[in-house]
Swiss-Prot record:
An individual GO BP term: catabolic process
CDD domains named in the record: ALDH_C (cd23933)
Domain of life of the source: Bacteria
EC code: 1.2.1.10
One term of GO molecular function: NAD binding
Protein name in the entry: Acetaldehyde dehydrogenase
Positions with a binding annotation for NAD(+): 12-15, 158-166, 277
Length: 306
């Protein structure tokens, strides 16, 4: 087994803390540092107890060190990452961005991870994107998708102030991902914050317009194959029932339609299981980081043999 890549987590909130627990299980990545700005942060306290070096002095502290990480996962805010990203690049640190900054290409593991393994900075799109774009991709790789619409319903309890402040950005970024990554010619995204108590787990509905002569069996199989792929890093990702095919009607805009229903239950590492919307972000980020590390080791090995 090759040496693990050293990792710093920038941000010490709920997402960063959940990500930490996932990275501690990784065979390819070694979390060494957690950076925040609040000295009383529970995330920093937990990281210290788990043996990480921590600081509340932000990115300046990390980049001033003689030993720098191979990779950084950033779960702060878009404006913080926009400032820090050029500095990571200058220091030769690979960046995985869990904010809406979207400086690097958006990555949805089942759809386009292999295309961006050498990118210096990759963006994890949005939680709704991670849950629904794989399904749009599953359909669009079989048939043309002129229009796709996703509706992400998440527990209000799992949506913090950052999510609430960025609802418009969420819909814009996710809609773009449905098109650019999912493969739909036109995309739309809707998010619903459900105030139900006890909190409900994340549920998503994906509508794709399809040709009249679409092969329903091939689409269904493609959907199931992609669900299985997502389950390799998010075991709680599942179809609620078989894809539903509908004839054109006034309700669906006169399109032949396939509708896919999924739910996402979190692993409960740090965040509660109902917060599948946050869990799929951290799990996907860990997956991307591990694949980048695996590719780097493979490239190094090939170079050494040559």
């Amino acid at each position: 087994m090759a040496d693990k890549l050293s990792v710093a987590i920038v941000g010490s909130g709920n997402i960063s803390t959940d990500l930490l627990y996932k990275l501690l299980r990784s065979e390819w990545l070694e979390p060494r540092w957690m950076i925040g700005i609040d000295p009383e942060s529970e995330g920093l306290a937990r990281a210290r107890k788990l043996g990480l070096e921590t600081s509340h002095e932000g990115v300046d502290w990390l980049l001033a060190r003689d030993e720098k990480p191979d990779m950084v996962f950033e779960a702060t805010s878009a404006y913080v990452h926009r400032d820090a990203a050029p500095r990571y690049a200058e220091a030769g640190i690979r960046a995985i961005d869990l904010t809406p900054a979207a400086i690097g290409p958006g990555v949805i593991p089942p759809a386009n991870l292999r295309e961006h393994l050498d990118a210096p900075n990759v963006n994890m799109v949005t939680c709704g994107g991670q849950a629904t774009i794989p399904m749009v991709h599953a359909v669009s790789r079989v048939v043309d998708v002129p229009y796709a619409e996703i509706v992400a319903s998440v527990s209000s309890a799992s949506a913090g102030p950052g999510t609430r402040a960025n609802i418009d950005e969420f819909t814009k970024t996710t809609s773009a991902g449905v098109e650019v990554i999912g493969g739909a010619r036109r995309g739309k995204a809707i998010i619903i914050l459900n105030p139900a108590d006890p909190p409900m787990i994340m549920r998503d509905t994906i509508f794709c317009a399809i040709p009249e002569d679409a092969d329903h069996a091939a689409i269904t199989q493609s959907v199931k194959d992609v669900v299985a792929e997502v389950q390799t890093y998010v075991p709680g990702y599942r179809l609620l029932n078989e894809p539903q095919f509908d004839e054109p009607s006034v309700v669906n805009g006169g399109n032949h339609l396939v509708t896919i229903f999924v739910e996402v239950e979190g692993a409960g590492d740090y965040l509660p299981p109902y917060a599948g919307n946050l869990d799929i972000m951290t799990a996907a980020a860990a997956k991307v980081g591990e694949e980048i590390a695996r590719e780097r080791v493979a490239t190094s090995t090939t170079g050494a043999q040559a």
